[in-house]
Structure formats: structure tokens, C-alpha cells
């Protein structure tokens, strides 16, 4: 497999990650004289500040997910490839992805964040992180399943356990989730 992008006379900027940083840079490079290649494991950009709305069923995933190809459909200097980066070879100006190798003149790593459990293995094993739409949908489905089971549960202690929710994390997402659940 290969990325199937012909090298032309323009210098190539490879951007790994289509979050806020990668998307902003790809937009800034419009008409800059560079060939821009965006690589992301998803074929869409997600709007993280509203992921809690997907988890709480306040919004659908399509409301906060925007296909890269649609965003950049009129760009002749832009290429998108859905892949994961496996290795970076700076001495060769090359990366290895899940679909092949890509050469670059400039490489920007904007792959985003990961959930920090601060070494707490119990939370890491039991928690449901919410960094993307898939995780938000998993949380939504778990919450709704527990609510449905609680409605038909005759044992009050079991019912309370099904309705007991712990939010770990006091950042923006944690506060938003706690707020929307309390409503």
C-alpha cells in the first residue's frame, strides 16, 4: 500500500493529526506554495468542546464531526490520507504509516492528547474516557442502558447502584458532564 501522492516541485508539509492544531495549520497553508498532506486516524475532524453533548444525547455525532475531504474539497494543494503513523525517520525525512511511507520537507506532529489517569490503575480500568465521538457514544449507551434497567428494577439498592455516576476530572469536559447529568 502507498499514500499515492505524487511528489511535485512544491515543498511538502505533512501534518499528523486533524484536531484544532492540525486543521488550523492546514488552513493557514492555503495558497502558500506548499503541498499539504494531512494524516489522521479518522477521516473527520471532531469538535472536542461539544463531545459531552454527544455523551448526554444533547447532540448527534454528525453535529460535531466534519469530514476532512469536505472541508478541503476545493484545495488543489491538499491531500488527506486516513492512516496511523507507525514510525518517524527524521534522518530520511520520512514517516511510516499504516498505509505506506510518506516523504516530507516539513513534518508537524499535532496528534492530540491522551487521557492522564495519574497512575491510578483502578480508574484507568473502570473509567470511560471521553476524548472522541466513539467514546462519547459508548458513555451515552452505557448511561441509557443503566437508566432503562433502573426503571424496571424492583430492588431499591440495585436501582440506586445503576443510577450512581462518578465523574472523575474537574476540567471543562468533567464539569460539563457533571452539569448535564445533574439536570
Regions found by a protein language model. Give the residues of each.
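Beta1-alpha1 glycine-rich phosphate/pyrophosphate-binding loop at the start
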Residues: 2-78, 165-166, 172-183
